[in-house]
Amino acid sequence: MSWSILELIRNNPEVLKENLKRRFIDTSTVDKAVELDKKWRQTLQEVERLRHEHNLISSQIPKAPKEQKSELINKAKELLKTLEDKEKELQKIEEERENLLLSLPNLVHDSVPIGPDESYSVPIRFWGKFKVYKDDVNEFLKQTNGHKVDYEVINWKPVGHADMLENVLRLGDTKKAGEVAASRFYYLFNDIVWLDLALLLYAIDTITSRGYTLVLPPYMLRGEVIKSVIDLDTFKDAIYKIEGEDLYLIATAEHSIAALYYKEEIPKEELPLKLVGVSPAFRKEAGAANKDLKGIFRVHQFHKVEQFIFSSPEDSWKYHEEMIENAEEIFRGLGLPYRVINIASGDLGAPAAKKYDLEVWMPAQAKFREMVSCSNCLDWQAYRMRIRYVEKNNKKGYLHTLNSTAIASTRAITAILENFQKEDGVVEVPKVLRKYLETFSGAPKEYIYPKKKPNTTS
């Protein structure tokens, strides 16, 4: 969204209606916004007329004959009361109009495939050699959408990541975590914890080497702030709120980093500002009640490294490609085979004008699973957060914001468990992670071996 959306409401509302149609959203909001804006402009004219009339009469009072002063004073008081009431009405209409405008999603980029759900998303490239169980070859080829890919057929069925974690390696315990916390929480032990830490360090190392500033952000934000970063009405069931306080736990470092320049102006010559944040991520996952019930793929709490860029409007599409390339470099380094997909319009979140997902092939599940989301939000977030750039001639405008996952540790672990396992249950540690583990005596060096489950009872 941008301030230009108000211009479209006034001059070309059909563009906004078409955008909502492309997102498969009801268009009545645009009609309501048009009517409210018309009412706002009419009320503004009335306020200006009353203000002018009040000022005119007030200016006549000192010069008026004594017998007319009392009448003019009373008339000025009546006008002032009418003006104050009309100004309150104007403010109320403006707030209603602003809330409607803020409810509108971003304008979909022309390169986004049009469709109501994820099934209309389009794979645009594949990387790596895919390990495919012999009975899953046809299903795999269907998911390549006709792209030429390199794959290896294996005769043994890989074990799913949940069973690998808890029953083969015995390095996780979701049952006990569910007992003492809730479902979708977990205990991890020893080698898997080291793997989690190594993944974070590897992602941070990769992104900071490209000139991004490392950030450790707040893990909570005030309601006013977080609703300017995301569509809180839509995602209120996904975000944890602290009871009795106006604070929300972040679902990603994107939220806190986006707010770093809340209500500030940035000299345009300082753009782009490239940052990479590391933080825990907290998610209710209320909309995923029956999805991924086992293991650590979809959980309430995990560690995440997030890329973020504040960009000038003319450069944001260039940086969108840069950020997905950074993410791809991380997964190429890990040796995890993946595809990049262009997300369909109906599956875009409200802030994004375009989004790429990077999905890794999971051989035990015979499907691709999301590891990375990379979005260009244009000025949708910046307008809400009042973050503007300032040119040397003092011309101002809303900058663009972009975000992308670098690594979500638990999801990356599930991908490693399925892609790097051997038939005997041993899991190879990706070579690129080993340098982050070699100095620690207790960390795995090359392989993670099946072990007995740690004793968690006293």
UniProtKB/Swiss-Prot annotation:
It is an enzyme of class 6 (ligase). It is found in: Cytoplasm. GO terms for molecular function: ATP binding; serine-tRNA ligase activity. One of its GO terms (biological process) is seryl-tRNA aminoacylation. Its main location: cytoplasm. Its EC number is 6.1.1.11. Disulfide bonds: none annotated. PROSITE patterns: AA_TRNA_LIGASE_II. The keyword Repeat does not apply. It holds the Pfam family Seryl_tRNA_N. One of its GO terms (cellular component) is cytoplasm. Pathway: Aminoacyl-tRNA biosynthesis; selenocysteinyl-tRNA(Sec) biosynthesis; L-seryl-tRNA(Sec) from L-serine and tRNA(Sec): step 1/1. InterPro entries: aa-tRNA-synt_IIb (IPR002314), aa-tRNA-synth_II (IPR006195), aa-tRNA-synth_II/BPL/LPL (IPR045864), Ser-tRNA-ligase_type_1 (IPR002317), Ser-tRNA-synth_1_N (IPR015866), SerRS_1_N_sf (IPR042103), SerRS_core (IPR033729), tRNA-bd_arm (IPR010978). It catalyses: tRNA(Ser) + L-serine + ATP = L-seryl-tRNA(Ser) + AMP + diphosphate + H(+); tRNA(Sec) + L-serine + ATP = L-seryl-tRNA(Sec) + AMP + diphosphate + H(+). Keywords: Aminoacyl-tRNA synthetase, ATP-binding, Cytoplasm, Ligase, Nucleotide-binding, Protein biosynthesis. ATP binds at R283, K284, E285, V299, E370, M371, V372, S373. CDD domains: SerRS_core. The keyword Protein biosynthesis applies. L-serine binds at T252, A253, E254, E306, T405. Consists of two distinct domains, a catalytic core and a N-terminal extension that is involved in tRNA binding. NCBIfam families: serS (TIGR00414). Homodimer. The tRNA molecule binds across the dimer. Belongs to the class-II aminoacyl-tRNA synthetase family. Type-1 seryl-tRNA synthetase subfamily. Catalyzes the attachment of serine to tRNA(Ser). Is also able to aminoacylate tRNA(Sec) with serine, to form the misacylated tRNA L-seryl-tRNA(Sec), which will be further converted into selenocysteinyl-tRNA(Sec). This is Serine--tRNA ligase.
